[in-house]
Amino acid sequence: MGGSEEAYSVYVLWSAKLEKRYVGSGKDPKARLREHSAGQSTFTRGGRPWVLIHTEVHETKIEALRRERFLKSGVGRKWLDEQFPQFRNRRKD
C-alpha cells in the first residue's frame, strides 16, 4: 500500500434467523457487524443478530468493491457456498 491509502475489507455476515448471507465492504468490518446487529442498517435490520463469517482485506477501495461485486454474482455466491457450506442461503423471500 502506498501513501495514506487505507485498507478496505470485504465481509460476509450470516443471519441464522433469515438463513441468509450479507456481503458488504468497508474499512472496519467489526464496526459494520455491530451496526448491522444493532439494526442501524435498514436492509439487514430484520436478520439480527448477524455473525461475521468471512473477511478479506484489500489494498484499495476499488479492489474491495470489485471483490464485493464478485461475491454478490452467481459465480461468487457459488464460491461462498463451496467455502462455507454451513452458511448457504436457504430462504428465497
Regions found by a protein language model. Give the residues of each.
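GIY-YIG nuclease catalytic motif and its immediate N-terminal context
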Residues: 1-41, 45-51, 55-58, 62-77, ...
